[in-house]
Amino acid sequence: MFHDQLSLVEHEVVSLAEAMPANRYDVAPIAGTVDGMRTFGEQVMHLATMIYMTAALVLEERAPYGPGAHNNGPDELRSKEEILTFLAGAIAYARRAVTSVTVDNHLDPVPSAFGSMPRAAVAAGIAFHSFNHYGQMVVYARMHGVTPPASVPTGGESPA
């Protein structure tokens, strides 16, 4: 039911996270001037953490990872490689969650941070929230001269 949305999240977010140089993972657009502004790496960590936590709601089980400091997941993950591995794990876990949504259970209420919601609405939130942060990640990337892979022309079209 939500496989295409999750595949799009995987394609867009993972390719952008891979494209950003490792030395830019600790950079925020205006670091030090806005309290709590996430670095690029923290954006990826937050996105992955929320994928884990939202997928756990869909599955009605305890999330494998808690929110950590500032909803950015495990504090010990710092390198680009560690963060990409965490993101890949989150997407795999979410794939299990969206696979569990069926015609028979998609309207069943599940608890969420916003109160009880249909399982399908919570599953849709995986992509919704992911693309909110993907947009922020695109800004970070472009500020550092990185063209998001999704914006690279695939033939005959002009660059975005």
Residue ranges and their predicted role:
Residues 3, 7, 11-14, 26-71, ...:
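Short, contiguous alpha-helical
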Residues 20, 47-50, 61, 90, ...:
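Alpha-helix boundary/capping residues
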Residues 74-110, 117-131:
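Acidic/histidine-rich alpha-helical segments that form the ligand environment
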Residues 8, 12-15, 19, 89, ...:
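Solvent-exposed, charged/polar functional surfaces in cytosolic regulatory/catalytic domains
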Residues 18-27, 97-107, 143-148:
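Surface-exposed helix-capping loop/turn segments at secondary-structure junctions
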